[in-house]
């Protein structure tokens, strides 16, 4: 297994790896993978109609908040919450300082990228449009950003795996009911 960057340096590579190397997307750990969920309730079972009532116990709000702050980072699972909160901050800083430029050698406004990431966090799991993100930044941060810039920055975030949008549900039925066709916007990790 080889792991690598979203912005690999292709200079000097004589072989693409075609037929030998498969690319796969690595995501942060789920609560089950980190040992913080029993896995008793399966999304697969729910989708297949096998729903059995289960007692999950009391859900502690503070514990849920801790899980969100800690995120799915493997290195964060055994650290203090204060240390765990520091890792995503440093990760975002490193991505904005280095990877954003390296992806295509284009200079971008780091401050506006930070504002857009904050706006995405405020609009997590919604079908917010680029124009609404622009308006959110203006309303909350009192900063102007062009809609085309929002679109370009969202593309960079997607290519750097900072976002992981959810495709809309597509029913294979003919119906008079209109289903929303926009992607739900998600950051790759809640932390």
In which residue ranges do the predicted regions lie?
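Conserved Walker B catalytic segment
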Residues: 1
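Surface-exposed, flexible loop/turn segments at secondary-structure boundaries
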Residues: 7-8, 171
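Interdomain motor-coupling "hinge/lid" segment immediately C-terminal to the ATP-binding subdomain
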Residues: 4-5, 11-122, 126
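Accessory nucleic acid-recognition modules appended to NTPase machines
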Residues: 81-191
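Active-site metal-binding loops of divalent metal-dependent hydrolases
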Residues: 5-6, 190
């Amino acid at each position: 297994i080889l792991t690598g960057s979203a912005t690999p340096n292709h200079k000097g590579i004589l072989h693409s790896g075609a037929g030998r190397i498969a690319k796969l997307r690595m995501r942060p750990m789920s609560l089950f993978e980190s040992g913080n969920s029993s896995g008793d309730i399966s999304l697969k079972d729910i989708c297949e109609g096998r729903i059995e009532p289960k007692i999950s116990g009391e859900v502690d709000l503070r514990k849920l908040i801790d899980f969100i702050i800690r995120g799915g980072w493997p290195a964060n699972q055994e650290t203090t919450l204060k240390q765990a909160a520091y890792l995503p901050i440093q990760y975002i800083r490193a991505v904005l300082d280095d990877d954003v430029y390296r992806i295509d050698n284009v200079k971008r406004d780091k401050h506006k990228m930070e504002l857009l990431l904050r706006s995405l966090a405020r609009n997590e799991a919604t079908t917010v449009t680029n124009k609404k993100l622009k308006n959110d930044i203006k309303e909350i941060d009192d900063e102007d950003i062009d809609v085309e810039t929002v679109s370009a920055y969202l593309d960079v975030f997607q290519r750097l795996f900072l976002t992981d949008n959810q495709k809309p549900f597509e029913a294979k039925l003919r119906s008079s009911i209109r289903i929303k066709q926009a992607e739900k916007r998600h950051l790759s990790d809640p932390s």
